[in-house]
Amino acid sequence: MNILTVNLILSTVIFAIVAKLYLIPALPRLELRTVVLPILLLHAMRHLGLMFLAPGAVFPGIPAQFAYPAAFGDLITAVLALIAIVAVVRNSNLARPLVGLFNVVGALDLIDAIALATIYDAAPHMGPAYWIPAFWVPALLVTHYVVFVLLGKRWTGPMCASEQLIVHACNDAYEAISSP
């Protein structure tokens, strides 16, 4: 029995149950940005996938055929999430296609990483980074599903107070890093 596979499946089921019980039923009442911005912010943290390339975060012998695609796939997805955040915050016409691009690339990256970890038996070499596929990947898979659901919904309308707070915080952060 592959313990990582069991962890991955059970964690995914648990996150899916949480989404089914609490998030999916609330979607019709929520503005899209209220849901998509926190998901994009979560995925912006996928730069942590670079840990698969960090000595000490993984054990020696981690298969390069798994580590490099997983690490750089996560990094690319994190960058796409950041780009999509800017588009969503600015209510750009590119928001929907950029969120879609982020979501397809990110979901395919996770599927690829799961397949490569299985094919190349990466689990015994993951060391402290084991928590990424045991916890993060299931949560991220479920949020990708939620974003696919959101992509089929309306993308206009007034912002609620919580959205306005997120948008203002993102705008302030953007201005802080872009001004000399």
Residues covered by each model-derived region:
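Juxtamembrane "helix-exit" motif on the non-cytosolic side of transmembrane helices
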Residues: 25, 52-61, 115-123
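Small-residue-rich transmembrane alpha-helices that serve as helix-helix interface/gating elements
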Residues: 9-12, 128-144
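Short, highly charged, low-complexity non-transmembrane loops/tails of multi-pass membrane proteins
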Residues: 157-177
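Non-cytosolic membrane-interface motifs at loop->transmembrane helix junctions
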Residues: 62-72, 98, 123-134
